[in-house]
Amino acid sequence: MDEIIKSTDNRYSEYETLLFLRDKLRKEAYAWKNRYLAEFGNLITAVFEQKIACIKKKKTISFCQMAVNRGKPVDQAELQNYLSQEMKEYNRKLSEMIQENEIAHSGEIISEETAAKIKKLYYRLAKQIHPDMNPKTNERPELKELWQRIVVSYRANDLEELEEAEILVNKFLVDHHLDGNEIKIQDIDTKIEKLKEHIQKIKETNPYQYRFLLQDQEAVQNKKRELQKELEEYRVYEQELDQLLEQMMKNGVSFLWRMN
């Protein structure tokens, strides 16, 4: 049977400390990601957009060549359907990148006082309903939804939203007689080790590692030059593909247009 540790145990204090450290690092990683996108997002998006333009033209050339090999005209409707399917995932990813980039560029800087209030309030709420500390949260859909709201607000530095969430959390706990209950954690030693591993992984990977790049202005400028170079290479490549398509047209590739 798994050992059950009550919230008064010293190992619980260690577990709680590690849990808050992991969440703090997650938030910092999220902030570094936004700073990275604020710095490089426009160029990264432009590079990817140019890349998928080249992919689309390569697929167009391939489709046309297959029609030529069969001795048939290129069916324009079939070509558009083919490209629509083939490019769907690329376009979805591009839309996602554009959205993330917009969010990163719209970020507001908060005061140290507000940051301290957010941290204190988050820790207070986490002690009440963090799913890794209070099993009741995953058992109650309302609490689970409130916790997700808290996580989003914490990462977004939204103090007002956190304050509203605290009111709702306290009301729910009182209404359902869940306030003041002693929290019990099963198999806490294993969970402590997993938390330590997770913390180390966050520290050693992106987006947390972006901080080393962003704190080095020379590295930032080098990164921008690399992205600009990549963008220019894709632009040149697109021109080459345009010339290839134009040559195919000159060599007699014909298109079949269907009238509605």
Which ranges hold each PLM region?
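Short alpha-helical basic/polar micro-motif
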Residues: 41, 119-120
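The canonical J-domain HPD catalytic loop and its flanking helix-turn segment that engages Hsp70
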Residues: 102-106, 120-139
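Chromatin/DNA-recognition segments of nuclear transcriptional regulators
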Residues: 134-159
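Short pre-active-site segment immediately N-terminal to the catalytic Zn-binding motif
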Residues: 110-117
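Short "pre-J" leader segments immediately N-terminal to J/J-like domains in DnaJ-family
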Residues: 1-110, 153-260
